[in-house]
Amino acid sequence: MMFGRIEAKYYQLSSKPFTMAADAEIDDVLYSKIEPYSTGMLEVSDLHTIFWERAGNPDGQPVIVIHGGPGGGSQPGYRQYFDPEKFDIIQFDQRGCGKSTPYAELEENNTHNSVSDIESLREHFGIDKWHIFGGSWGSTLSLIYAQNHPDKALSLTLRGIFMCRKSELQWFYQHGASHVFPDAFEPYQNHIPEDEQHDLISAYYERLTSDNVEIRRAAAKEWTRWEMATSRLFPDPEYLDKAEDLDFAVAFARIECHYFINGIFVEDGHILNNCNNITHIPTTIVQGRYDMVCPTVSAWELHKQLPNSRLII
């Protein structure tokens, strides 16, 4: 799931006072646009090399920004969520997406690989501990990384909670959000023959992994358009246009579907069942009440498992 919008009036890692009028533009409440001070590639396996960037203050507090999708890629706008004078803002493209290579590759691409890659980046930069910031799928990966390396997390700031449980996948990709966005859901559903519509994720996976490039691209466009149409409170034509960028859509859709059909390579409910070792980590959960992609119930259930967390809806 993609990082789509400002969903509350506070971010733990921002020292900027935050008040937001209903008609405020996002650039009015974020820090100014900045460019990276350093970029590079890190070889994480014989097959995969991941892109990374650092922006802000090289001597500032390190924060790792974990993007959505999976397959969404890092974004320049993510740099604007942090005070560039106080934070060393680190982003990377997860395996197979963005500037990482090979593009749209599914082999050696799973949650455990991603956790390992985050730790490889930390070691590569010589960072002892860092803040962790992630939204949507980025919240999923942030939590699993923290559960595997609780001693490396200074804090967790999570937006749009998505834990990739079967119930969440069913809500968005099969039945649930479809009742709120029937007009956007219909093209996504009707791309699949009626006799396969009982399991849309499986049907899309078959097409997204087809040997026929045109079949892959057509499926990627419809998968991506469905998500882009529902990821923002107010429809954004530029956001919808991402589905027309088939280079982006193919990696985004293939990698997402690959993870989802495999239950993100962990048991269902893994995150909620493994919160005991991260209860000490300062955690802020920011959730949009009307988020169609990442329903509020997930943030609520996570907050109950992390009683010391701060939940902002």
Where does each model-flagged region fall?
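Conserved hydrolase catalytic core segment
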Residues: 129-167
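A catalytic-pocket lid/entrance helix-loop region that shapes and gates access to the active site
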Residues: 153-202
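Conserved alpha/beta-hydrolase
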Residues: 84-99
